[in-house]
């Protein structure tokens, strides 16, 4: 009965996350329509082929990021199949749009525990991946924009440099192992007596090593590049006159994402991310405010559409593979 209630709670969270994400998507599209035509925004139109290309790139990118999280969870010792873990991460990711910054991780932990997995490993691997995303986002912005990235951080380049340094320290294997044990004790799991996986029978590989962390960082940096290409496709699909190039748009998108993520009072970085993007578009590419507003709001609509699309694809693949119920041997009662 306890497991059923946990599964019910995870399903309720997912439904709530989908509702909030859909609400933000509809509101974003309404805002985009309200920006009007040439007089207000400098002119915009819809080119389906470019928009579909951007949607495809963003969807594939998110599926790749979800697979990277599953790899991290397995590296920490959790036995989880990719076709189970990918939709779990993508579904929990939608929790960012629920007011309050804890729902993304709380939803992932509840789902994993409901499926008979370690919620502490799920949370720690998600946090580790998020740190990598933030660090590589700052690096992508620095590579593409140079000192101009400081415009999104109050005009100072020192702020993102110090932030990246502090985040990198948190990825040290020893810190990750101790964090796993602490989270396990906090969540009252059996793995509290050792590094990740020890005492649970889920594996003893432990935290990723330095070389593996570097590979994860390179993969995430490639994901930022794909986001830049995707945003360029969205711009080509909406604006009368093309702006920028994929590399510059990668830096603008990455910097605005980091700023939005750090906005603790804003679900999913709403408004804050768009404001940072409009500012950077104006500063770096001399884009008028009206055109920048169109692209910033379109980028939000695109991001949510990609999240919903990736989750839908992952769920279809999961059900096509016939994955039902807990996959952990102990949760199934297998010998």
Q: Positions of the model-derived regions?
A:
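Predominantly cytoplasmic-facing regulatory/coupling regions of multi-pass membrane proteins
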Residues: 1-90, 137, 143-262, 284-335
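Membrane-interface alpha-helices at helix entry/exit sites of multi-pass transporters
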Residues: 82-87, 101-104, 113-130, 287-298
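Mid-bilayer segments of alpha-helical transmembrane spans in multi-pass integral membrane proteins
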Residues: 93-102, 130-138
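Re-entrant/interfacial helical elements at transmembrane boundaries that shape
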Residues: 102-115, 265-283
